[in-house]
Design a protein with these regions (language model features):
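Substrate-binding groove of N-acetylhexosamine-processing glycoside hydrolases
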Residues: 1-139, 189-203
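A short beta-strand element within beta-rich, extracytoplasmic domains
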Residues: 240-254
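Surface-exposed turn/loop modules enriched in turn-prone residues
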Residues: 257-258
Length: 258
């Protein structure tokens, strides 16, 4: 089942909706014919469908934002054989389609141009990885708090951070800024980038210097369910004087997140 109700891009930029991501690329890659189907089942498929719920939509423009341009990717799923799909070619047509939507006054999402970040502690430093689902854009970033431009650092690999740092980045195409500015405020303290031992893979988020947003599926929250055992150890790698200890959390009716 395909839903257009989930976040269609990096969640830091998106209006609140249902948890989880379903980007333009995810919809493009969707295949309604399942691998475990018998061969004769494919001929019985009458078409494709995407579901749209409106609990988080307050006006028609909110619906347009969630539907377009992902509806174009769904159409590509419907009329193109899997082996004939070409993401790069689709994106070229997408630019013209977006111009058409703008001319019609349709409030379409530009999420395809926004940056998804990953901040991972490694060897006493933070490695900041920046990605965009569009391979035809360039990413430029700054470390001095100014907004990025074509004259800024061009991103060509993980950025190594070893102190409190503000990283700003955006995508560019043909000399024009395409996506929103990503603003990462990395805070360094005694625990930042230190080795952490625990029982969940994403517990490293506790020492990556970055606070989560209000959207708990933004890939910056470490979550435990009600009956989970919580145990982790941060190795400060030496004797330290601690004057203050703090931890942030949010409570969800179904999950407790720290």
């Amino acid at each position: 089942v395909l839903y257009l109700i989930r976040y269609q891009g990096p969640q830091w930029f998106e209006p609140v909706t249902y948890f989880g991501n379903n980007t333009l690329k995810d919809v493009f890659d969707y295949e309604p014919v399942q691998k475990d189907w018998k061969p004769e089942y494919e001929s019985l498929l009458m078409g494709v469908q995407a579901c749209m719920w409106t609990e988080f939509c307050n006006k028609p423009e909110d619906v347009d934002y969630l539907v377009f341009p992902r509806l174009a990717a769904l159409a590509e799923v419907a009329w193109t054989r899997p082996e004939k799909k070409d993401w790069a070619s689709f994106l070229k047509g997408m630019d013209s389609f977006n111009e058409h939507l703008a001319a019609k006054g349709i409030a379409y999402a530009r999420s395809m141009y926004n940056i998804q970040h990953t901040v991972k502690p490694e060897d006493g430093a933070l490695n900041v990885t920046l990605e965009c689902i569009r391979p035809d854009v360039e990413i430029y970033y700054t470390l001095n708090g100014s907004n990025p431009a074509m004259s800024s650092h061009r991103y060509d690999g993980p950025i190594c951070v070893t102190k409190t740092q503000m990283v700003k980045a955006a995508t560019f195409m043909n000399g024009k800024q395409m996506g929103e500015i990503l603003d990462l405020r990395l805070t360094w303290n005694k625990a930042t980038a230190k080795p952490l031992l625990g029982n969940k893979k994403n517990e490293m988020l506790l020492v990556n210097g970055l606070r989560g947003s209000l959207k708990y599926t933004d890939f910056e929250w470490c979550n435990w369910n009600q009956n989970d055992s919580i145990s982790f150890t941060i190795d400060l790698q030496g004797r330290e004087i601690l004057n203050k200890f703090s931890i942030g959390y949010r409570f969800s009716p179904l999950e407790v997140l720290y």
